[in-house]
Amino acid sequence: MEFASPEQRRLETIRSHIDTSPTNDQSSSLFLNATASSASPFFKEDSYSVVLPEKLDTGKWNVYRSKRSPTKLVSRFPDHPEIGTLHDNFVHAVETYAENKYLGTRVRSDGTIGEYSWMTYGEAASERQAIGSGLLFHGVNQGDCVGLYFINRPEWLVVDHACAAYSFVSVPLYDTLGPDAVKFVVNHANLQAIFCVPQTLNILLSFLAEIPSIRLIVVVGGADEHLPSLPRGTGVTIVSYQKLLSQGRSSLHPFSPPKPEDIATICYTSGTTGTPKGVVLTHGNLIANVAGSSVEAEFFPSDVYISYLPLAHIYERANQIMGVYGGVAVGFYQGDVFKLMDDFAVLRPTIFCSVPRLYNRIYDGITSAVKSSGVVKKRLFEIAYNSKKQAIINGRTPSAFWDKLVFNKIKEKLGGRVRFMGSGASPLSPDVMDFLRICFGCSVREGYGMTETSCVISAMDDGDNLSGHVGSPNPACEVKLVDVPEMNYTSDDQPYPRGEICVRGPIIFKGYYKDEEQTREILDGDGWLHTGDIGLWLPGGRLKIIDRKKNIFKLAQGEYIAPEKIENVYTKCRFVSQCFIHGDSFNSSLVAIVSVDPEVMKDWAASEGIKYEHLGQLCNDPRVRKTVLAEMDDLGREAQLRGFEFAKAVTLVPEPFTLENGLLTPTFKIKRPQAKAYFAEAISKMYAEIAASNPIPSKL
């Protein structure tokens, strides 16, 4: 007599609660038994995700999967299960879309800007073989690491495809990384070759003797006659991209395709503290993540995608893999974010994936224009906006009348064809999301993920009009919430379970490169990755991010503080562009450093009749500080912050937190230790002010 394995019994239990009978809705053939929620104590229907019949060690039923694939985690594209690697994915695209436009750029060889010129999928395939063969010509071997140290342009993706075809490991570097970080990554990954541009070449040459593993530097956009000559004995060859192409074409090599379990890339996370960590991702990891995402969001050969987010970031990388699978045309921005709107007008993309930072700028620009347009136009916009919003809320198709009268002009700001907007990397305000949906008449979806999960952990589902959450689990993973008692978050919380978000599935990275200790800190023995983010389950199985565990600290009285939660509240203040919350175990209260919005400050000062010579002087005016802190307090009360979570003092600064002043990571997260040191004097003064004005000492 044969006994079923635990895995088989678990699968049968799940299937027993699923009705696979035919329905009119062919988009999803899996539906939960109508009696499941009442007949079973552990398997119930949520609109977008399901709770599995898996009892955890804690005795709780707390593992969620996407409703679209509850019985099996997705690891391959459902329509093309033969695609197991990035190489397979590109081969599929070339075979299917060889003559289609693929890579477009406005930047001419002489540096001038014109119309987009395009390379087809077939042409890109030919170039990737030449680049791969050129690397072999220079002694780069299968399994060696190859660096990419330049901003988005067609050559970046060609090199990445070459790495996949010949089983090299691609290692992207942010072009904004400082010399020390670049040096660390090159040495830590033991890079054999690195692709750069003339600007980043100068950085590499400044410490060439300190990166001994490098044997080949390829300069993209540089002419051979302008390349520097290196002294004999360095062991390093510098060639132009065009020369490498020529060398490769003269000696083409057959591909050396990787296996799904082979390393595809090592992505170095910028990190808010310490040195960068190398996230090891396999071909199987990346394919699984994008395949899972494709179950819900689909790209088509008719789509045009604008690429401006750093390709060194996993968000943009995953979008490109999805684009290849769908045969999408990718147009690159000209390299200047301040001219991005001009690129939109010329490219007229249908897909726009960005971060809240830019969406907020679009929102501010449109609302500012509406406010200054006059009473009649402002009122017309409000009527059109509210009418369209109400239709969306009620599940009706908004009248095209309002688009013709009001919104088509706004749509033209992004080229007039955008059908899909994606947002990630940080939370998008619900107000901004609703605004984008209404004004641009397109699908706007927010996702949540991290480099260690190959990108997407969860994303909003098509047709879900509720904002303020990050959707249901990617069909390629399962999610659970783990109690964090020190922050008073538990999966028993009512009305919504809360806890640290943990993820498991084929999307989970293999570990940090050469760092077993930090790998063990984030990845447990059962394969669960602990994200450090705090989430809750909303009705319908939607995940909402509410806090951050990793950056918590204690105040003197023992209360735990999650600064990012508080900063997200305060950045809604009209005066606040950026906010840094500081506290420590020596003080019982928090203080805030606020980078102000210059235009709002100037307008407010003018309305109050306050005279000043420069923005710095205005920031130091006690009346201004008092007003800003009062508005921050109002937002804190509205968000129901606890008493000890309120900032008791604020310092206003005219300059923004930037990559250049060392206060932000390349993904625009605050570097807390650096910010603490940078603003040490201001922090000390604020605590002195609190102590002087409060009979109860702030220090314990």
Swiss-Prot record:
Residues 1-29 are annotated as: Disordered. Interacts with PEX5. It comes from Arabidopsis thaliana (Mouse-ear cress). Pathway: Lipid metabolism; fatty acid metabolism. SUPFAM superfamilies: Acetyl-CoA synthetase-like. The keyword Nucleotide-binding applies. Residues 7-18 have a biased composition (Basic and acidic residues). It comes from the Eukaryota. Activation of long-chain fatty acids for both synthesis of cellular lipids, and degradation via beta-oxidation. Preferentially uses palmitate, palmitoleate, oleate, linoleate and eicosenoate as substrates. Can use myristate and linolenate as substrates. Functions redundantly with LACS6 in lipid mobilization for beta-oxidation during seed germination, which is essential for postgerminative growth and seedling establishment. It is an enzyme of class 6 (ligase). This is Long chain acyl-CoA synthetase 7, peroxisomal. Disruption phenotype: Seedlings of the lacs6 and lacs7 double mutant were arrested in postgerminative growth due to inability to mobilize fatty acids for beta-oxidation, a necessary process to pursue the development. Induction: Up-regulated by ozone and salt stress. Residues 19-29 have a biased composition (Polar residues). It holds the Pfam family AMP-binding. PANTHER family: LONG CHAIN ACYL-COA SYNTHETASE 7, PEROXISOMAL, LONG-CHAIN-FATTY-ACID--COA LIGASE. Its main location: other. It is found in: Peroxisome. Coiled coil: none annotated. A motif (Microbody targeting signal) lies at residues 10-18, 698-700. Its cofactor is Mg(2+). One of its GO terms (biological process) is response to salt stress.
